[in-house]
Amino acid sequence: MDVIVFHHALGLTPGVQAFADRLGAAGHRVMVPDLYQGETFDSIEAGVAHAEATGFDTIIDRGVAAAAALDDRFVTIGFSLGVLPAQNLAQTHSKAVGAVLCHAAIPLGTFADTWPGGVALQMHNAPDDSWGDFEEAEALVEAVPGAELFVYDTSAHLVTEPSLPDHHPAIADQILERTLTLLASVS
């Protein structure tokens, strides 16, 4: 299965690349576009400031442009900020067959009024994560038949990012395993 992974506000960190590499080791063809064009940040706040200065529409456009290189059906994966292009593609691209949205959610209606039939949705979020848009995740899962919401007992945001104190290896491993399950189900 082709997979396109979109990084969080820190940029294309070694942690994001390592997650993608683990998907590749499981036999998937993985693309990890750099939406920040080489820049990385040490804090969420600095990364968000960069994203705001760049423009969220520009970040989405870069993600959509990267997906043009995919020749086959694909699954999008987005971590926090990366949910913007991931969800956009899942809702609007004819070759998207699934989305894994981690640590964020965008309201239905932002990119399209409905979730397309036949596009699987898996979400990973924590109610106590102040950056995580948990209520939006619940609303999206409620609106999409067959969607899954995995809830984690933490207030940390980027639990999958090893370079941060928020990193939670056990949760990161659960997210990876559940992602692999979704990929197997749509392959």
Predicted regions and their residues:
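Serine-hydrolase catalytic machinery in alpha/beta-hydrolase-like enzymes
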Residues: 1-71, 159
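Short alpha-helix in the alpha/beta-hydrolase fold that links the catalytic acid
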Residues: 19, 132-142
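Alpha/beta-hydrolase fold nucleophile elbow
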Residues: 70-79
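Gly/Ala-rich beta-loop-alpha elbow adjacent to hydrolase catalytic centers
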Residues: 78-82, 86
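A conserved short beta-strand
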Residues: 95-105
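Short, proline-enriched alpha-helix->beta-strand connector loops that line the catalytic pocket
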Residues: 115-121, 145-146
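Short beta-strand/loop motif that positions the catalytic acidic residue
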Residues: 123-125
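C-terminal catalytic histidine-bearing segment of alpha/beta-hydrolase fold enzymes
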Residues: 147-187
